[in-house]
Amino acid sequence: SVYMDRLLIPNFEKLLKISTQKAGTQRDLKTDIRDVQDKFKEVLEYDPQRFFVSNKWFFGLDTKGMPIYFGMKNLLHTQITGASGFGKSVLLALLAFQAILKRETTIIFDPKQGGDEWLPNVCHKATQVANTPYFFIDIRVKTAQINLLEGMSTDQIINLLIVGLMLEDRGDAADYYRAKSRKMARFVGKNYQNGMTLKEISETYDEYFRKNEADGFADALQELAEVVSINASGGILLKDVIDQICVIYVAGDWEDPKHIIIQRMLLARIVQIVSERDNTVDTPKQVCVILDELSFQISKIFGDALKVIRDKGLHFILAHQSVKDLTNVPDNMDAQAFAGSVMANCPLKFTYRAVDNETAQYFSDFSGTVLVDDESRSIEQTLSLTDRILPEKQIRQTERNLIDLNMMLTLPPGTGVLFGNGIAQISKICPIQVKKTAEAKTVKGFEQPSIYENSELSASLVFEKLG
């Protein structure tokens, strides 16, 4: 009898639990990480182009297979986070494709050598659909492609050199030499002749810089002079690219310090061009700047621009792996202030699975709380020393995050959470299917034909015919 009691009671209670009908007013419960993945309903693969519309931005399908749209015509600053391999580049490609179709000048910065495997191909395909010019710039290639200083005013050259070479005072002994370097930056700005390259400036004035105790400035310019790609006597004019609606894919380098400096200076130059646009009467054309692996693009001018540049028609799409990346800043910046600025000025956020607790907890808290039921039960012990659960239960109201920590740590690949578009929504992102082409990564030297030939920039695009 004791044996039967110990055997039957546990199994009978399991049967009761399975067959008991829950109360109609019972709320959701707290999650269990061991079975939370079963709650993610599988969304079949789909073609994102079927869901593109002209006045909204498509952000994937929800758990019911319905499209998620951001309803404003102009996209806000957008932040994308997630571990490597979970789909950041897929979402970047999705948003870049839509920006190109919406006739936005689109500039992609990618610190991976040679560029991403698929993103350039998606952007190239989009330019074919929209019939807009496409340019692939590879900073590492020994081909002159662009003149960084072409078309700049004296003040812009001075500011670009100061920001790019981080010559601001920092309150230490080296400020003495930084002041000397800033003086040489002013000299370069005032003596610049249109068409001069950084290499020509370095070769012409190197001796003068060193005589004026600016050896550090001279050495820095010598390093930049070695980067052939930005020392073209002609080439692509960034101002014309922005004014005429083009697409530029900039493949950089995450290892070589001088290439990282060039990437930051190119971004600073774009910010300068957009900042001087007049919005008194006409609304400036939209410019979309995509920064993949944000930590390689962080600079003081970017941090400041993020706060004010939308008024001039520029919106950023930032991608990085965790919130800790935002504190990996150059010496002339405050890490916490920059991280706070990114979080505050990117109202749209999309995060894939987090692999560190800090990122997972941040976005879980960001999703808000919902009311759930917390159940407690009473147990009695029988004469056979078997625990028996009594039928009476107590339920109390408590809270948990809408997207809790367990969900953030177990999101399937290709699935993320969109914040800033109403209540946080789980979204499935599928890639735009394209074929790899050599043209997507073909570098054009400055001797190439005009960038505006054979482009029908005034043609309207019919979104319904896509896909």
Please tell me what each predicted stretch does.
Residues 1-26:
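Transmembrane-cytosolic junction motif
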Residues 8, 19, 28, 32, ...:
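P-loop NTPase motor domains
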Residues 306, 312-315, 320-422:
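Conserved ATP-driven motor cores of ASCE-family P-loop NTPases powering translocation/secretion/packaging/pilus
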